[in-house]
Amino acid sequence: MITEKQLIEIKHLQDECEKFEEINLKLNWEMLRNRKNDLKEDFFYYDKDQLVGFVATYYFGEKVEICGMVHPNFRRKGIFSNLLNEALNNLAPVSTILLNAPEVSKTAKEFIKKQENCTYSFSEYQMVWKEQELIEFTPIVNFTKAVQLDFAFISNLDVVCFGFEKNDAEKYNQRILNEPDRALYIIEVNNEKIGKLSLLRENNESWIYGFAILPEYQGKGYGKNALLQIIEKENKIGNEIHLEVALENSNAKKLYTGCGFRQYNTQDYYVIKR
């Protein structure tokens, strides 16, 4: 578990790093705030009483993502390399290790170039809905709060729509169902389950994750209708609306841009071989 003091220190360091390079770091704050197990997942480097380096690991079933940062005034001292090695040495058994870095971070690119065991894997767009006149629509899908009985359906969607391994999908969704700050919804048409999405609200932002529609129901307007309902609801409460989409998922990107989302950041992922 991370203490409240440590969370404040991490946020301050994040602000310094993002301001220096004009980047957006993906630190998965909902996971940092809800650390529960005994596994060592977060690694800190202090200069006297100041946090100047931080690396975190995030488990998604048999896959782990790693993200970190070092204060601009303390770079080129081996701090990130040491923290990354410490994180790698403390990993639970996993099948895939991914290092995450903002596409525009020159510091990250320089570091990764020097890593012989680091290979580019894929990218994700981070998108935001720009406040505008909402597209007119009539609700044709319904949302119900997911419960444990929906677990198999939800996990199967991640296998079918996102290429998850079954075990990874089950581990990931068990965590999502238990996260207090995130709501997981089933999307239905005529009482038939056709999709799902999760919604995380924090700091006047609403983040849409894991948005998926069964293939046999795609291309019928259900996904767009669901998205427009979420946009309308979150916009009414004054939240800025964000989501992420894989770079290669052109159909999803077309759907999001058609609903008013615009790309503002790209996150790159690199596989680390051990």
For each feature predicted by the language model, list its residue ranges.
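Active-site rim helix/loop that mediates acceptor-substrate recognition in acyltransferases
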Residues: 18-48, 163-198
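Short amphipathic alpha-helix that is part of the acyltransferase structural core
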Residues: 1-30, 137-166
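A structural microfeature
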Residues: 51-53, 121-123, 195, 223, ...
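Conserved acetyl-CoA-binding loop-helix of GNAT-fold acetyltransferases
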Residues: 76-89, 210-215, 219-234, 253-258
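Conserved donor-binding loop and adjoining core beta-sheet/short helix segment
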Residues: 18, 27-82, 197-209
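Acyl-donor-binding surface of acyltransferase catalytic domains
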Residues: 60, 72-139, 270-272
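C-terminal "cap" of GNAT-fold acetyltransferases
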Residues: 123-147, 239-240, 244-250, 262-274
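Conserved hydrophobic beta-strand within the GNAT/NAT acetyltransferase core sheet
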Residues: 66, 98-101, 208, 241-245
